[in-house]
Amino acid sequence: MSSNIPQNAVEVDTLSSIYTYKELSIDKLKHEYEITVGSNYIEQKVNSRLQEIAKNAKLPGFRSGKMPYDLVVTNYKNEALEYVVNSTIDYCSSDLMKKIEVKSHIYPKVDIMSLPNLNEEGEKSNFVYKLSFESMPEVPVIDLDKINLKKVEARIEEEDIKGFVDSIKTRFPSFVSVDDASYQAKNGDKLVIDFEGRIRNKLFQGGSNKNFKVTLGSGTFINGFENQLTGMKKGETKSFKLKFPEDYQTISLAGQEANFSVRVNDIQVAEDFGGDDEMAKKIGFRDCSSLKNHAKEVIGGQCEEMRDLLIKKELFDYLDANYSFDLPTDVVRQEQQRVERELGSKDDSCKEAERRVKLAMLFMKFSTEHKISLTQNDILNVIVNQYISKDVPFDRVFKHFKSDRQFQELVRGQALEHKVTSYIIEKVNKEEQIVSVKELKELFGNI
């Protein structure tokens, strides 16, 4: 090894002491070391690599492995040096981690400070690089005996069931045509219309339709259109001008003034469902009793979901307030970027990212201590419950999961969080609190 070794460096007695290291700085979890490898070692390894390459090297005019060695050196020296440098960095960095007893680390960064010029005669400069990394923090184990949570249970009353049934009447009205020719359309009525829209006397794309159904007050058309239809009668025709919003999604129409002509072909009003049993049958139930049972199940499911989210937030708040340890800044920075994409804002994004990283590390430590592992079903449940929708089929999400490592880590983290929190909530002390459905909704609305 070259004698050109930095002062205060520690020489490592491994593989003929191929490297020395010097501590540059340690700040909480951040570590920086300077590693020096003798030029003689690099030169020997490069020569060995070139000899390996020469066995199969090809060049026009020469058979495989028969290229003159000086041509091998000329054509492959840089490639060999790159290979040796990378493998040396891998070995020395890994060996140093063992020496300084760093069990795990995050995002190591290498900055090459100097490379030996192997073309120089005489003593050559050493290979020197800086290794920067963050070590994993010592994460405490969650103490279940110290956690006390509130388990909120909702009491479903007849009033709640009636409110649910009434909401069905509002959401799924049955419409009938109006026979009275003098009837004037009002908010909530369904109109069957023909319409045309023109800009500078030219019909624009999507600006006309026949027998189009629109419910007044639904906001189906641009602002002001449905207001113009209010008060019209069956068979009546009307023309009016409206201006498209400046931020309208179709750029060619944004901010443009259009002339509309509308004819009302029919006016339909919401029909009274009649008796409860008749109403239940119209929306697919055997009788009113079946509908009420369905309502109770739906309300119960909604209350259970709100209850679970409330107790989960209470647990998260407790862990965030009662456990403190150094967090790796690179991990927090990455999570902060994800938070900003989710929320569309930088406000409090750092604080939220720190909270998420802290909880994730607590859950990871807890899962190791309590031997909680993920199954394929745990992963699939997260994919199905959080990522599948009418517009995003399972096959597309699962294909993305298999091909994207970052998405895999995200889904696995969510699955582990769910499994660990469920385990903790099941084991800790819980005080039951009975509330009304309205009170539960208010509690949920405040989180």
Swiss-Prot record:
Keywords: Cell cycle, Cell division, Chaperone, Cytoplasm, Isomerase, Rotamase
Its EC number(s): 5.2.1.8
One Gene Ontology biological process: protein folding
GO cellular component, one term: cytoplasm
Record field: catalytic activity: [protein]-peptidylproline (omega=180) = [protein]-peptidylproline (omega=0)
GO MF term set: peptidyl-prolyl cis-trans isomerase activity
Domain PPIase FKBP-type span(s) in chain numbering: 188-273
Cross-referenced Gene3D superfamilies: 3.10.50.40, Trigger factor ribosome-binding domain, Trigger factor, C-terminal domain
Protein's job: Involved in protein export. Acts as a chaperone by maintaining the newly synthesized protein in an open conformation. Functions as a peptidyl-prolyl cis-trans isomerase.
Domain notes per entry: Consists of 3 domains; the N-terminus binds the ribosome, the middle domain has PPIase activity, while the C-terminus has intrinsic chaperone activity on its own.
Name of this protein: Trigger factor
Organism of this sequence: Wolbachia sp. subsp. Brugia malayi (strain TRS)
Source lineage: Bacteria, Pseudomonadati, Pseudomonadota, Alphaproteobacteria, Rickettsiales
